[in-house]
């Protein structure tokens, strides 16, 4: 078990800010019931599930293919379990540009999602809410999926465990994946075509802890940049970029991503400047995240390491408005975590670390906050500085 390689990418709200990027007409669609035997999956840039810890404690947790461990937010842990026993300490790295000290609870942890259950000896306790916001109590990873074939239906909002004799439809495309060395990480092949026509046929780590489509790691980016393929990128520094601390990304729009023979055109991706962590690992070309897989019906065979993809109703949906800021939900406000250098938000006077009380008059605690999904082309931010509220208007990029 290699806890240092556990991956989380911060839940930054760049394009959809406080919700996912579902189009307005899709919001009004009548919600269909999930199939019998399936469990609800709420997709909001991450895949959220109702998890039962130790048979009786409900938690809202993210499924992260970049993790081999059960992680529990330290605030949730303290309020629910009190002072733990059999505790240890360890340094943990992830999407941030470094490592951070975490607590290990080796008292044994059973948990279930729907009718499926799993037990792990150890849980990692750390401040996840500074990364993910206050909507998640923790995350679970690949050990829960051992020996299973699992459907992740982003458009339908459910996860389903396939029965042993069930056949996968012929309209799915099978992609043979591989492990990262002997570590349980899913490496998936895909192609990235840049605006100058150059195509990278690469191997990418499947990381459902990352909300974006794709991020090139720094080793791959340095080579491509030297060859002149990463023109017109724009830089953003994150105060909290994931486990391990800060992160520096560069945003650019590419011609297309091709996966399983299907191409998605005009996609905004990032490349990393990190020197440490998951985004500096030269054993793969980068990370591929939820926003890409949300365009498909996905079945993962965790026995044979095969991913099956079928385009869903959101396959051709354009990316939503891009804003030059990233902020994290924190109870009664949003905290500005990053600003695009020279972007509209920075020029309008927004600062990293600012506390946003409301967006277009809507607070994060309001029941009608879904009106911000998707965000309009212009945002009026109520920013609290000291005892004053400052109004800042930000246009999309």
Segments (PLM) and residue ranges:
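Hydrophobic h-region of N-terminal signal peptides that target proteins for export
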Residues: 11-19
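Pepsin/retropepsin-fold aspartyl endopeptidases
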Residues: 18-397
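Bacterial N-terminal signal peptides that target proteins for export
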Residues: 1-7
């Amino acid at each position: 078990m290699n806890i240092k390689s556990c991956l989380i990418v911060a839940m930054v709200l760049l394009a959809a800010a406080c919700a996912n990027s579902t189009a307005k007409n899709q919001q009004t669609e009548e919600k269909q019931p999930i199939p019998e035997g399936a469990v609800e999956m709420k997709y909001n840039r991450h895949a959220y599930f109702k998890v039962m810890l130790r048979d009786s404690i409900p938690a809202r947790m993210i499924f992260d293919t970049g993790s081999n461990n059960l992680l529990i937010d330290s605030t949730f842990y303290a309020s629910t379990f009190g002072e733990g026993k059999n505790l240890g300490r360890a340094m943990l790295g992830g999407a941030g540009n470094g490592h951070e000290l975490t607590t290990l609870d080796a008292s044994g942890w059973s948990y279930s999602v729907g009718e499926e259950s799993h037990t792990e000896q150890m849980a990692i306790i750390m401040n996840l809410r500074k990364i993910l916001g206050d909507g998640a109590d923790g995350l679970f990873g690949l050990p829960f999926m051992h020996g299973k074939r699992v459907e992740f239906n982003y458009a339908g909002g459910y996860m389903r465990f396939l029965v042993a004799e069930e056949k996968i439809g012929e309209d799915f495309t099978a992609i043979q994946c591989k492990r990262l060395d002997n570590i349980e990480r899913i490496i998936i092949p895909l192609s990235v075509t840049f605006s100058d026509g150059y195509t990278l046929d690469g191997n990418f780590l499947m990381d459902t802890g990352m909300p974006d489509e794709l991020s090139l790691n720094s080793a791959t980016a340095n080579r491509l940049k030297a060859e002149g393929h990463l023109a017109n990128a724009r830089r953003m520094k994150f105060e909290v970029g994931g486990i391990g601390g800060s992160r520096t990304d560069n945003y650019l729009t590419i011609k297309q991503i091709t996966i399983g023979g299907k191409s998605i055109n005009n996609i905004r991706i990032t490349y990393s400047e990190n020197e440490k962590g998951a985004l500096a690992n030269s054993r793969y070309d980068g990370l591929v995240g939820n926003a890409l897989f949300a365009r498909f019906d996905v079945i993962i065979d965790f026995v044979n390491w095969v991913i099956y993809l079928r385009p869903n109703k959101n396959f051709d949906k354009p990316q939503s408005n891009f804003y030059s800021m990233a902020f994290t939900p924190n109870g009664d406000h949003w905290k500005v975590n990053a600003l695009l250098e020279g972007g509209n938000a920075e020029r309008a006077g927004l600062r990293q670390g600012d506390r946003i009380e409301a967006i277009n008059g809507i607070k994060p605690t309001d029941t009608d906050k879904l009106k911000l999904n998707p965000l309009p082309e212009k945002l009026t931010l109520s920013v609290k500085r000291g005892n004053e509220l400052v109004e800042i208007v930000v246009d999309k990029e």
